[in-house]
Each structure stands twice: as structure tokens, then as C-alpha cells.
């Protein structure tokens, strides 16, 4: 049992007891991190003037050390052994004239720097004393938008109450660089970013691979006023946003889901109101331990940012067009609305098209193939599509000038440039023609018969097409930048649902 005597005499004066009673409450918990066989960054506590002794009395006392004690300031470090990896704990008892106080000591020991040496996000949360279901226990996971564990589906926030919002860095396991971080609000052209602080590079200690990384400049709080806001962090190659849409649009080669946000819970699992854990993914392996912040005094925006374009009851807000039949004429009942779904039988060639036009938007739609095929599609791949940015003055035809997100078995996400429209994909522009194909560069489809989600972002001439959370095609400098949208009927039975749009 380790013991350090801090005072050998006690003076029972009235002044002494007043000072002791009014002293700042002791910090009760100390959390350290270090690579195995090394010494952590120190932490300290100022003990009450009435302190008599401080001693380690339970747990893994060999992994913690009292570095020094001067003028009531006690400095502690974590010293894991060269063969220990994981979390260890001990307790330090501070004895004063008015009683005893127990200080809890927690240490996280890791294998080494970066890569497979890093702790899992679940381990990080455990070391920090947060009983959160992260959703996975391995190091790597994935960057798809499916919610994991206790993750919330919201990425924008309000300030919850008076005072400032706090954004406190509590963990970082990333490559070594300075990291600006902060919040953003909506503006006319793009997110308006407000830097709060900058995480430090490695110095005497590996600040990029530790708990409670140092801030090189700035602070850890801000006041957004009444604005709705999201969070961002900027690494050497890209900025990661709390909203997927900006990651898809600005940095489609990186993680689409760049943050996972969890309600903060204490060590017993009790919810800490208006507090959240913000976890960033810097690369694409899905570990989400790159930069981790505790957020305080915030509440999520829970209203849906999307507007439904299809009411599930009828085609109000749309009109239909069928080849050789015309507008709003459907003698063979090609379009059937039932169970909040648009069932396109597909016997006729045509579409349902919006009456309104849209610019700078994020569009979503679910589709599923049916069984039947007709005409030229009897022995071919099932085919359909979503066309967008159709000019208001463009007459109904097969097919109007637009950009098409191909929905065809095996090819979902291809660009088709219709009516001599053009776009550049990876720096190469299509040849203008009645219809030109620009193939997707990766695949995200589910097997025929399952529901798929297709997303389209059109923003100032840049078009991003996403299939089941995977960016499959990106085009720039499109010749058509705004307009109407349509859902095709192209000789294959298909079902559409959850048709909605968000103005950006």
C-alpha cells in the first residue's frame, strides 16, 4: 500500500476551518492515457489545506504514480507496464481533518501509435466513463448511414439554454496534424463555418493519440445565438461535416457518414440531458475514434428537413405523360397509387413529372423492381430512371432534356445525358447527343426485389448520385442546373416510395 504524508500537524483555528469549508470541491476522477510502457501526460489536483495524508489503497496501484507534491498541488501520472493493453483503475484516498475523500483513477493503455494500435471507440467511451452502446466493438466498422447502437438520427442542433455551447475534445486517435474544428450555419451559397479551436500536433506527448488532446489555439465554447448549427472538423485533405449531404457534395471520395453522434450517458447508463458525444471518421475504415468531443448545452433539430413530393394517395403536384397517348391519359392504368407507393406497371413508355421546378436540392427516392417486363425489355435488364433539372419550358417528350440517374438492373447510378445536355465526370465531358451514358464508378445496388434508396444532389451544376448510402457517380459543370423531376416508366414493373426533396 502506497502512502504519502502531506501534513504532520493540524492547527485548529477558526480561520483554518473556514478556509477548509469554503475550498473548491476536489476533482473526484482522473482519466489518463498512455502507450504501454510509457508515462502519460500528468494531471493535478489542489488538495485542501486540511489534508493529512493521501494514499493509494485499492485497484491497480502499480500503474499510477504521485509525481510530485508542492504547495498542496498533487501531480499524478499513469505508468502502464510494457505488457498491459486496456483499461485499469485504482483509488487514492485523501484524508483531511473533516473526513476522507476517494479519488478515482482510470488509465487507458494502448499498443502504440496509429493504425491497428488504436483503441476502439467502444473502449474510448468506456475509459471516459460513458455507458453508451456504440454499436460495434471492433476497431473498424463502416461509413454507411445506418444508425449504430445509441446513435441519434439528427445532425443539426439548437442551443438548449442560457450560456455557451461547449465542444470539449475528449479523445483523438488520428494521424498527426493540427485540426481546426467548430460549427457551421446555413448560408446562401454553402455552410458558413465558424472556427472554435485547433487541436494540437504532437509535442512532448502524442497529442494525436490520446485522451483529452490539447488545444493549440482557440477555445472549447461558442455562442450560436438562435441559429441552427452543425459541426465540422478540417483535416489536411477535407472537411468533415455532421450532415451527410455536405460530405457527399464537397468530398464524395471520403466518408459520407463522417460523424456519429450519441446521447451522453454516465457510468450507470443515466442520460445526461443536453449532452452528446460527437465522433468523427477522418478516413474510411469506420472506426470513428479520430476526433471525439463532448457537446454540452445543445438539443437536436428533430423536424424533417425534407418535403414530400408524393403524398402516397394520388399524383397531386405531378402530371403523367405516355408515348403515343399524351398528358394525363392512362387508359391501361400504367400508374397505380396504393399503400403510399407509386406502382408503375411499366407497360407504356412514359413518366410522372413534377409541376414545380427545383434548384440546389437533395432528392431521395426508394425503388423496388416488380416481376413484369414488356416489349423490348422482356429478355433485357429491368429499366427505369429518375430525370432531373428538366427546364420548365421543355415540352413533354421521350425523353425531355435533363440529367438522368439511371435505374436499371446492375447499372443504378449511371448518368444519362438527355436532349444534348452535358456534364463532366472525372474531368471528361460527354459528347452532346440525344442520349449519352457516363457510367458509375462503383456499385451500391441491392438484389432485385429488395428496396433501394437513391439520392441525388444537384448544386450549382455539380451532381452527385448515391445508391444505398454509397456515392456511385459525381458530375460537374452540368449544362442544366435546375428544373423539374420525373420518374420513368420504361417497360419494366417498378415501385417508387418516399419521394422527397430538401432545398439546399
For the regions a language model picked out, list residue spans one by one.
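Low-complexity, Pro/Thr/Ser/Gly/Ala-rich linker/spacer regions in secreted
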Residues: 110-117, 298-308
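Short beta-strand-plus-loop segments that form exposed binding edges in beta-rich domains
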Residues: 233-236, 280-285
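Bacterial Sec-dependent N-terminal signal peptides
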Residues: 1-23
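A recurrent domain-boundary module in secreted/ectodomain proteins
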Residues: 283-302, 499
Amino acid at each position: 500500500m502506497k502512502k504519502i504524508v502531506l501534513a504532520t500537524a493540524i492547527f485548529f483555528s477558526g480561520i483554518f476551518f473556514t478556509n477548509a469549508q469554503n475550498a473548491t470541491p476536489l476533482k473526484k476522477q482522473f482519466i489518463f492515457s498512455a502507450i504501454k510502457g510509457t508515462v502519460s501526460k500528468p494531471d493535478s489536483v489542489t488538495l485542501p489545506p486540511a489534508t493529512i495524508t493521501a494514499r493509494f489503497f485499492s485497484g491497480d496501484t502499480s500503474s499510477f504514480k504521485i509525481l510530485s507534491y508542492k504547495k498542496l498541488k498533487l501531480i499524478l501520472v499513469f505508468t502502464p507496464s510494457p505488457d498491459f493493453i486496456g483499461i485499469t483503475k485504482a483509488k487514492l484516498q485523501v484524508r483531511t481533518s473533516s473526513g476522507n475523500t476517494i479519488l478515482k483513477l482510470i488509465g487507458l493503455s494502448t499498443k502504440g501509435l496509429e493504425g491497428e494500435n488504436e483503441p476502439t471507440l467502444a473502449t474510448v467511451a468506456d475509459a471516459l466513463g460513458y455507458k453508451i452502446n456504440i454499436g460495434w466493438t471492433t476497431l473498424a466498422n463502416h461509413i454507411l448511414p445506418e444508425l449504430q447502437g445509441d446513435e441519434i438520427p439528427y445532425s443539426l442542433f439548437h442551443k438548449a439554454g442560457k450560456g455557451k455551447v461547449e465542444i470539449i475534445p475528449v479523445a483523438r486517435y488520428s494521424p498527426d496534424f493540427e485540426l481546426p474544428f467548430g460549427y457551421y450555419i446555413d448560408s446562401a451559397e454553402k455552410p458558413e463555418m465558424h472556427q472554435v479551436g485547433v487541436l494540437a500536433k504532437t509535442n512532448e506527448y502524442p497529442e494525436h493519440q490520446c485522451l483529452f488532446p490539447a488545444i493549440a489555439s482557440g477555445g472549447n465554447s461558442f455562442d450560436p445565438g438562435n441559429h441552427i448549427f452543425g459541426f465540422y472538423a478540417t483535416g489536411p485533405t477535407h472537411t468533415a461535416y455532421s450532415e451527410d449531404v455536405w460530405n457527399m457534395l464537397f468530398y464524395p471520395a471520403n466518408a459520407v457518414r463522417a460523424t456519429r453522434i450519441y446521447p451522453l450517458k454516465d457510468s450507470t447508463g443515466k442520460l445526461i440531458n443536453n449532452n452528446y458525444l460527437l465522433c468523427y471518421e477522418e478516413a474510411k475504415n469506420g472506426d470513428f475514434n479520430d476526433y471525439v468531443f463532448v457537446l454540452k448545452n445543445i438539443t437536436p433539430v428533430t423536424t424533417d428537413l425534407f418535403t414530400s413530393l408524393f403524398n402516397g394517395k394520388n399524383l397531386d403536384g405531378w402530371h403523367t405523360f405516355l408515348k403515343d397517348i399524351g398528358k394525363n391519359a392512362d387508359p391501361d392504368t400504367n400508374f397505380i397509387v396504393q399503400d403510399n407507393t407509386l406502382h408503375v406497371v411499366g407497360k407504356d413508355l412514359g413518366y410522372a413529372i413534377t409541376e414545380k421546378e427545383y434548384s440546389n436540392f437533395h432528392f431521395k427516392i426508394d425503388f423496388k423492381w416488380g416481376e413484369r417486363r414488356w416489349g423490348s425489355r422482356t429478355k433485357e435488364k429491368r429499366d427505369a430512371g429518375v430525370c432531373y433539372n428538366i427546364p420548365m419550358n421543355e415540352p413533354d417528350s421521350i425523353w425531355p432534356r435533363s440529367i438522368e440517374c439511371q435505374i436499371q438492373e446492375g447499372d443504378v447510378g449511371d448518368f444519362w445525358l438527355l436532349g444534348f445536355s452535358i456534364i463532366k465526370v472525372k474531368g471528361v465531358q460527354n459528347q452532346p447527343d440525344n442520349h449519352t451514358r457516363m457510367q458509375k464508378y462503383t456499385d451500391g445496388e441491392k438484389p432485385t426485389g429488395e428496396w433501394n434508396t437513391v439520392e441525388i444532389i444537384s448544386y450549382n451544376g455539380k451532381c452527385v448520385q448515391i445508391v444505398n448510402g454509397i456515392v456511385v457517380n459525381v458530375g460537374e459543370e452540368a449544362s442544366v442546373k435546375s428544373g423539374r423531376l420525373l420518374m420513368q416508366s420504361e417497360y419494366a414493373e417498378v415501385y417508387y416510395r418516399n419521394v422527397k426533396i430538401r432545398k439546399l
